[in-house]
């Protein structure tokens, strides 16, 4: 049986990346919540840096 998680960097960035988050109102809310909580890594895009 094929597993559900098939790692793919491009898919991950397009779905959970900074630009994807900024594209929708709810995505911006996610970023705001993570900033408020004090997360150093806001999105998967920040993991590379």
Curated annotation (Swiss-Prot):
Species per Swiss-Prot/TrEMBL record: Mycoplasmoides gallisepticum (strain R(low / passage 15 / clone 2))
One Gene Ontology cellular component annotation held by this UniProt entry: ribonucleoprotein complex
Top-level taxon in the UniProt lineage: Bacteria
GO molecular function, one term: structural constituent of ribosome
InterPro entries linked: Ribosomal_bL34 (IPR000271), Ribosomal_bL34_CS (IPR020939)
Record key words, sorted: Ribonucleoprotein, Ribosomal protein
Similarity comment: Belongs to the bacterial ribosomal protein bL34 family.
Official protein name in the record: Large ribosomal subunit protein bL34
